[in-house]
């Protein structure tokens, strides 16, 4: 897409946005996270129902990291070079990704075989990434540096809210509306099916809300004709620029990327195994057709919803802490708290103690979704924010790909296919990430938020979750 001449707004002249404008540009993340958390909470049980063994699960989840690795930098590269006077720069990707992801969510619970579900997960993850990746660059496009913390933390609020509702949906449908949570062998339960239908609606509606209520600034970082010409160089030119950007990555981004490299496997292992582990190890299920399995996976979803509520609430406190301690110290402490939550899961016998474990995970998740991006905000070149956000994602998905391909051996040979021990391993990796964050990231004294974020966030704090 190209445009004729237009007025350019320099990065230094970006106007400050009101709280309502920041909310409008973040609502889409509510829908996107609704879709992500539906699959995180339910794909493990769905695979189990369709006949997967515990050591098969990592490979079946390969879609998430591999599509992130391939799709996000490409979408970042293309969206940096997209402009239309009516549809903007990032919003066309939001729209297309949301429509096709919603279709995949509707079809997913009708899967009749393991490989049909796995194939639909690939479709969902490809177009989920198309919708999601430009949102990070969208914040940097729209907000001045003094509001970057606020923008990314608002995304954390939306992510926490969307994730909590999505994860709790099967439990709510079963316990409030008496929708069945068990089914015949190889059939996905009705409460999971209806959760996916609800998720498809929220995914599409929330993203469309952001698309139609938020305007974008014309690209001002380079003459847009030059960027349009660059976009016509084809795949080879795009790959060349991605490789060049990796070679010239800002030093601080390298260290933050290493922190991400060890953080995300911990979360990935939890999403692999947690729900089914709760059903078998804590509720005592013996097969995927008995009542204990249905109740266990639903309760696990409820605790996952709870950690998203913790994320939502802790996001109000996070600005205070970041202003006082600095971004890197705040992030390191939150990671250690999350690690404690993951490690302690393996020692739980009383199901209600899982809420204590998930409190730690929710605190870490709030920081993971905001602090790394806030630390990056001032070090990326303005003309390459989209592509660098995609590259940053490499260091999330590469360890996840390694886990998908190699954790089968670990489960068989080291963990005796114990799902709870797999979750615990993720906690130890998160400790390593926290140590790297605290000791190796260099942070200037004035690099905390340039002003308190509290005043505007207090308006939201008065609302119910």
Predicted regions and their residues:
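Intracellular loop-helix junctions on the cytosolic face of multi-pass helical membrane proteins
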Residues: 1-20, 112-119, 130-131, 135, ...
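Helix-loop boundary and gating motifs at the non-cytosolic
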Residues: 7-65, 254-259, 263-288
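Loop-to-transmembrane helix entry/capping segments in MFS-fold secondary transporters
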Residues: 54-55, 145-155, 297, 380-392
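Helix-to-loop junctions at the C-terminal end of transmembrane segments
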Residues: 70-87, 313-327, 411
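C-terminal ends and interior cores of transmembrane alpha-helices
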Residues: 94-113, 336-349
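Intracellular juxtamembrane helix-capping segments at the cytosolic ends
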Residues: 130-143, 367-381
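C-terminal transmembrane helical hairpin of 12-TM major facilitator-type secondary transporters
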Residues: 322-372
């Amino acid at each position: 897409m190209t445009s004729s001449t237009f007025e350019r707004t320099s990065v230094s002249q970006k106007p400050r946005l009101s709280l309502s404008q920041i909310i409008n540009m973040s609502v889409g993340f509510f829908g996107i996270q609704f879709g992500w958390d539906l699959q995180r909470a339910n794909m493990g049980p769905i695979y189990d129902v369709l006949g997967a063994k515990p050591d098969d699960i990592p490979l079946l989840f390969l879609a998430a990291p591999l599509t992130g690795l391939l799709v996000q930098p490409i979408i970042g590269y293309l969206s940096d070079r997209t402009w239309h006077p009516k549809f903007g720069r990032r919003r066309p990707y939001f729209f297309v990704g949301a429509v096709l992801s919603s279709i995949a969510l509707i079809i997913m619970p009708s899967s009749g075989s393991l490989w049909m579900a796995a194939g639909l997960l690939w479709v969902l993850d490809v177009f989920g990434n198309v919708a999601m990746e430009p949102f990070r660059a969208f914040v940097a496009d729209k907000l001045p540096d003094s509001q970057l913390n606020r923008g990314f933390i608002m995304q954390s609020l939306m992510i926490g809210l969307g994730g909590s509702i999505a994860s709790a949906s099967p439990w709510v449908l079963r316990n409030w509306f008496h929708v069945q949570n068990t089914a015949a062998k190889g059939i996905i339960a009705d409460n999971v099916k209806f959760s996916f239908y609800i998720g498809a609606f929220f995914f599409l509606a929330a993203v469309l809300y952001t698309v139609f209520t938020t305007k974008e600034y014309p690209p001002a970082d380079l003459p847009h004709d030059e960027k349009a010409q660059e976009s016509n160089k084809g795949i080879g030119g795009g790959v060349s620029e991605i490789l060049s950007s990796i070679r010239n990555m800002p030093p601080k981004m390298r260290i933050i990327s290493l922190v991400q490299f060890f953080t995300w496997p911990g979360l990935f292992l939890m999403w692999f195994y947690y729900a089914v582990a709760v059903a078998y190890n804590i509720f005592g299920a013996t097969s995927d057709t008995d009542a204990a399995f249905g109740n266990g996976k639903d309760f696990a979803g409820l605790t996952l919803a709870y950690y998203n509520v913790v994320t939502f609430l802790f996001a109000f406190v996070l600005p205070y802490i970041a202003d006082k301690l600095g971004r890197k110290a705040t992030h390191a402490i939150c990671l250690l708290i999350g690690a404690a939550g993951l490690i302690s899961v393996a020692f739980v016998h009383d199901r209600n103690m899982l809420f204590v474990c998930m409190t730690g995970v929710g605190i870490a998740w709030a920081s993971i979704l905001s602090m790394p991006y806030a630390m990056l905000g001032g070090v990326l070149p303005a003309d390459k924010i989209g592509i660098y956000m995609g590259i940053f994602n490499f260091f999330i998905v590469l360890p996840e790909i390694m886990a998908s391909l190699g954790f089968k051996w670990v489960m068989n040979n080291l963990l005796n296919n114990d799902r709870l021990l797999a979750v615990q391993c993720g906690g130890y990796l998160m400790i390593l990430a926290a140590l790297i964050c605290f000791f190796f990231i260099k942070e200037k004294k004035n690099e905390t938020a340039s002003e308190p974020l509290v005043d505007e966030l207090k308006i939201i704090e008065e609302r119910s979750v």
